[in-house]
Amino acid sequence: MTNIRKSHPLTKIINSSFIDLPTPSSISSWWNFGSLLGICLAVQILTGLFLAMHYTADTATAFNSVTHICRDVNYGWILRYMHANGASMFFICLYLHVGRGLYYGSYTYTETWNVGIMLLFAVMATAFMGYVLPWGQMSFWGATVITNLLSAIPYIGTNLVEWIWGGFSVDKATLTRFFAFHFILPFIISAMVMVHLLFLHETGSNNPTGIPSNMDMIPFHPYHTIKDILGLLLMLTALLVLVMFSPDLLGDPDNYIPANPLNTPPHIKPEWYFLFAYAILRSIPNKLGGVLALVLSILILAIIPLLHTSKQRSMMFRPISQCLFWLLVADMLTLTWIGGQPVEHPYIIIGQLASILYFSIILIFMPLASLTENHLLKW
């Protein structure tokens, strides 16, 4: 008799995706982040669901409802801080996951890669709207500044912004719709994750060498499940340490001041995971140019498969490309730091140089380095 795991219509889908899935034996811990992102999404949906039971999306009561969750709801404080810091963990895993894809050439699976880029945009949109919900000073002014960027679009910009606001400023209508979208998007993201996995399982996983590993596969369970559980324990430990010991470490103190349209905070800045893009936006003096640079800083990932000029897929055996990759990482960290600094000398020029370097590495230096390495192979 065939094992029910392999014959039942429902369990055989799970079996072929998570149990008997043939997986390269050589994949390292850099391949853990996909499963960690899945766990992050589940944690965010669950904590978010319970928070939504007590939250009110109204300008008069939103701030107080969050305070009520933290003070009066049983374990409300842990729900709130797990959700807020879970978002930070989500983005750490996301950036490491994308970085892994860049380093090991996973972007040559173009369908999986493109769905991944759409997922990145969806998660960023969700996180932005979630940051608006507590209705503190940074929530209100962050929403005002970021939505206002759309007014840079020629001709329709102003109408578009007022349409998104639901009025002539960020107000009750804006908060209500942001809550609605913040609630629905994670479920859309879950569906997109299924598509992401569907495309991945069409081709199978890449591996550190970038060489096809069809002749050296092992079942996903128990080998990689055990490995993923180790990553999960490490991530949950980090998250719980953050939540229990310094829950406000990554937040902004200004968000503990209720939103006041008459009082602008001295430094408006988004959450830390958007600072690199915010620094690129600020480094261009022109509004439309800044908005385009902001969008392109993420959208540039879509053309990376076209810029792949190397004869090898992975960077494992390409030292020049490796140096450029780590330079790009250092550059992104520099941009993240600059994004949190005031707009004054020397931060302005550092931000501009880091922004130029960011695009130059991806568009010019990396393809050239790959061509150089191709020539070196002939020696």
Curated annotation (Swiss-Prot):
Annotated heme b b562 binding sites: 83, 182
A matching Pfam family: Cytochrome_B
Keyword set, alphabetical order: Electron transport, Heme, Iron, Membrane, Metal-binding, Mitochondrion, Mitochondrion inner membrane, Respiratory chain, Transmembrane, Transmembrane helix, Transport, Ubiquinone
Keyword Transmembrane helix in record: yes
Binding site for a ubiquinone: 201
Keyword field contains DNA repair: no
GO molecular function, one term: metal ion binding
Membrane topology annotation: Multi-pass membrane protein
Binding site for heme b b566: 97, 196
GO cellular component, one term: respiratory chain complex III
GO biological process entries: mitochondrial electron transport, ubiquinol to cytochrome c
Cell location: Mitochondrion inner membrane
InterPro entries listed in its UniProt record: Cyt_b/b6_C, Cyt_b/b6_C_sf, Cyt_b/b6_N, Cytb/b6-like_sf, Cytochrome_b, Cytochrome_b_C_euk/bac, Cytochrome_b_N_euk/bac, Di-haem_cyt_TM
Superkingdom as given in the UniProt entry: Eukaryota
CC cofactor: heme b
SUPFAM superfamilies the UniProt entry points to: a domain/subunit of cytochrome bc1 complex (Ubiquinol-cytochrome c reductase) (SSF81648), Transmembrane di-heme cytochromes (SSF81342)
Membrane-spanning residues: 33-53, 77-98, 113-133, 178-198, 226-246, 288-308, 320-340, 347-367
Cofactor: how and how many bound: Binds 2 heme b groups non-covalently.
Function: Component of the ubiquinol-cytochrome c reductase complex (complex III or cytochrome b-c1 complex) that is part of the mitochondrial respiratory chain. The b-c1 complex mediates electron transfer from ubiquinol to cytochrome c. Contributes to the generation of a proton gradient across the mitochondrial membrane that is then used for ATP synthesis.
Note: Heme 1 (or BL or b562) is low-potential and absorbs at about 562 nm, and heme 2 (or BH or b566) is high-potential and absorbs at about 566 nm.
Family of this protein: Belongs to the cytochrome b family.
Subunit text: The cytochrome bc1 complex contains 11 subunits: 3 respiratory subunits (MT-CYB, CYC1 and UQCRFS1), 2 core proteins (UQCRC1 and UQCRC2) and 6 low-molecular weight proteins (UQCRH/QCR6, UQCRB/QCR7, UQCRQ/QCR8, UQCR10/QCR9, UQCR11/QCR10 and a cleavage product of UQCRFS1). This cytochrome bc1 complex then forms a dimer.
UniProt-recorded name of the protein: Cytochrome b
Organism: Natalus stramineus
